[in-house]
Amino acid sequence: MTDPIQKPEGLKLWLMAARAYSFPASIIPVLLGSVLAVLLNPGLQFNFINFALTLIGCILVQVGTNIINDIFDFDKGIDKEDKELGIPHGGSMVISLGFLSIKQMKTAAFVSLLISFLIGVYLFTQSGMWILYLSIFGLLSAIFYTAKPLALKYKALGDIQVIL
């Protein structure tokens, strides 16, 4: 039996809920894509603001996805304490440990996806239709990773969706 997990406060709690340890999955593709864009287009003017907004938007989509995943996994009973080992497992565990309510998590998911959508709209005005299509795909992927009717994670398609 392990000691109970201490509830973090403030920013630490929200970083736990967002699963900040997983952010490299969003950061690395943006960094690599930006480096490739510069290397393959020597005359291209690098726009740091668009780069930073893309990075922030991608991280916020991941935050929203992680939080939505926690909500649906909690509802399905997937994120819970392992009775044999006496330890929690699955997701951030902030709901099952009572650190945050489902309402707080839904609000956080909505806010992070809304901000990422607004960033996508701005980038669309700067870059054209292709960014709009990518933004819509990213937003729908964030929601339907665990949400019905697709719930890709539960059909062994979640990893493929994450790679895309």
Positions of PLM-derived features:
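Residue-level recognition of specific faces of alpha-helices
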Residues: 14, 70, 159-160
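Transmembrane helix-loop junctions in multipass membrane proteins, especially transporters and channels
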Residues: 38-42, 70, 74-78, 125-129, ...
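Juxtamembrane loop-helix boundary motifs flanking transmembrane segments in multi-pass membrane proteins
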Residues: 3-10, 87, 96, 149-152
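Aspartate-rich (DDxxD/NDxxD/DxxxD) Mg2+/diphosphate-binding motifs
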Residues: 65-111
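Intramembrane alpha-helical segments
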Residues: 91-164
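Topogenic membrane-insertion module of multi-pass membrane proteins
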Residues: 1-49, 53, 57
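Membrane-embedded alpha-helical segments that form the functional core of polytopic membrane enzymes
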Residues: 31, 43-68, 133-137, 141-143
